[in-house]
């Protein structure tokens, strides 16, 4: 994670990289304002448990083998931090990668506002 990131944002990305969904949920404010966009869907969730389920949908699909989740550099834009992660794996259609960028605002020392944008799965190695 970038040195410009707050402790809570860094901890959130670390939890994503480790696929520690319960740990990520524990960093979310009870009144989290969450929205995300993937290529085919707009996601909204009310509360930390629903956000955890969204994260599991993206990163714990039983039909896919996730080989790696790696943090990518972030930055700060006023009161909003940008953080991200890149995923590599294999699914029914072969090897893939995708990247997600998260925009985070803190509230009471937790993630209180979270927007995530996904690149969509892209084939790797001639897949």
Region spans (language model):
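Alpha-helix C-capping/helix-to-loop hinge sites
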Residues: 15, 35, 89-90
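Short, low-complexity N-terminal intrinsically disordered segments enriched in polar/charged residues
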Residues: 1-30, 125-127
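A beta-strand edge to alpha-helix "cap/lid" segment located at domain peripheries
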Residues: 52-127
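Soluble or luminal CAZymes and related metallo-dependent hydrolases
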Residues: 4, 8, 50, 96
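Short non-domain terminal segments
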Residues: 10, 19, 32, 94-96, ...
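A solvent-exposed, acidic/Ser-Thr-rich amphipathic alpha-helical stretch
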Residues: 23, 29-74
């Amino acid at each position: 994670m970038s040195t410009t990131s707050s402790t809570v944002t860094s901890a959130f990305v670390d939890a994503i990289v480790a696929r520690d969904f319960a740990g990520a949920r524990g960093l979310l404010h009870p009144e989290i304002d969450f929205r995300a966009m993937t290529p085919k869907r707009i996601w909204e969730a009310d509360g930390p448990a629903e956000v955890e389920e969204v994260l599991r949908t993206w990163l714990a699909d039983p039909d896919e083998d996730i080989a790696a989740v790696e943090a990518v550099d972030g930055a700060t834009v006023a009161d909003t931090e940008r953080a991200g992660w890149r995923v590599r794996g294999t699914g029914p259609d072969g090897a893939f990668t995708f990247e997600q960028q998260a925009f985070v605002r803190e509230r009471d020392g937790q993630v209180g506002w979270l927007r995530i944008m996904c690149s969509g799965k892209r084939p790797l190695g001639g897949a």
